[in-house]
Amino acid sequence: MSELLNAVEEGGVVAIEGAPGRPVLGSAGEVDRVLEACFAAGCYAALLYAENLPAAFFDLSSGDAGAILQKLRNYGVRLAVVREAAAGGTSVRFGELMAEERMRSDFGVFASRDEARAWLAA
């Protein structure tokens, strides 16, 4: 692992976690870092904080969210993102994406780490 991505086991569920408040992915193309960490830990779950993601992730027109989510889906990795509810910079289209994602079980955005971990454990 690295100092930015670590395997954390809680309640029998192992997930790769990003370091809170630290940038991990500068671009969508760097999602391989998350996949490599998952493969090394033998897990299929990741918990990242909004600050770990590319700055434009929550602006759907950037393509970052789509590229990252598709790559993780291709490998069966579930992603939980912790983001304050009041955080700005979310496009209208991202809200539409979240409405669609609620019908799936491989991506979610949560207000707290505890909520994100509970979802990954479900």
Model-predicted regions and their roles:
Residues 2-122:
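Amphipathic, Lys/Arg-enriched alpha-helical "gate/interface" segment within cytosolic domains
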